[in-house]
Amino acid sequence: MRQAVIIIGSSYGDEGKGLASVTAAKEKNAACLNILINGGAQRGHTVEWPDGRRHVFHHFGSASAIGAVSCADQDYIVNPLLFRQEKAELEELGLRPEMYVSSRCRVSLPWDMMLGQIIEENRGAARHGSCGCGIQETRLRFLHSPWALSFGDLTRLNKQEFTAYCERIAREYLPGRLRRLGMTMDQDWKAAVESGEMIRRSLNDWEYLKESVRMYDDWKTLSAAWPVLIFEAGQGLALDAENREDYPYLTPSRTTSQESARRIAELPGKTETEILYVTRSYLTRHGPGPFPSECPKEKINPDMIDRTNVPNPHQQALRYGLFDGKAVRRRILLDLSETRKILPEVRSSVMITHLNETGGKLAGDEKLENFIQGFDRCILSDRPVFPE
């Protein structure tokens, strides 16, 4: 019987989904297809090998660390520039990552990234917490048909046609979008657009991406070849695009397990499915927005250091909070109830990471033994390195 594990962050992202994906793949001990189901390369899922190697996965599934094949499904946003950078990093670590890309994937280009960063800069103190990868701007560009060429569409263009497409985005779409927003580019941005180097590099990056991956049209045919499917969602339930309570401090994609469940439901036969909800033993949030349990890091552990979520111009410094068991449980139960409308027999599990930083317990008033009640199983992790 085919098996599937859906990896879901239970809060604001950065819960440990990279470790969870590798752990799930190792447990299955079979050939895995690791599906990137939402968002884009703004995700940052960290994996640490027992031999000391370390990588933050953006454009590849985290389970590719142990040989799984990655799959960018139809709602994932592909970025040729960031793909090329990451593939080179993985090859330096001794990996030869393989990847399938849906012909329906949207493709993010440097002008989308530029727009997102200009807009976020103009918000000043009211910034939303963009990662600077152009995810929202790519989604918005694809609402307008002249600019909405999918991965499959772009593969049918020759080099001259692809270059012309990029030139039109740079000379027509980009200034038009800024004009509608009442914004302008500073001299540095203008120089980057007018130099022509961005277009030349975009063509090279696109050709590299196109030659490095395998495109698929039919999800059922692709998935039939794999006994294990690991769906790796980006971000977390509290950042879901439909979470109106925290608007606009959200990610522009659906972060729930329903997206993966629908893909599983399309497949013939039965798929034994588990949702693995991931949480740290405390909470974090990178970027602005509501954070009810926020506290100084020192209240949790003054000595802990997050090597992945370093301060940056887009999201500033990582924020810390006590473990809010009531809020985490509410998000999980709501997500699970919706997914069981699609897959009634789905099992629910929880993985708690970073326990080494909180003395093996949850940071706050919630008792660990109380929180894990009601789940089909619980995985406790007190070290960042995946098990051998």
Where are these regions (language model features)?
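Non-transmembrane, aqueous-exposed alpha-helical and coiled segments at domain scale
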Residues: M1-E388
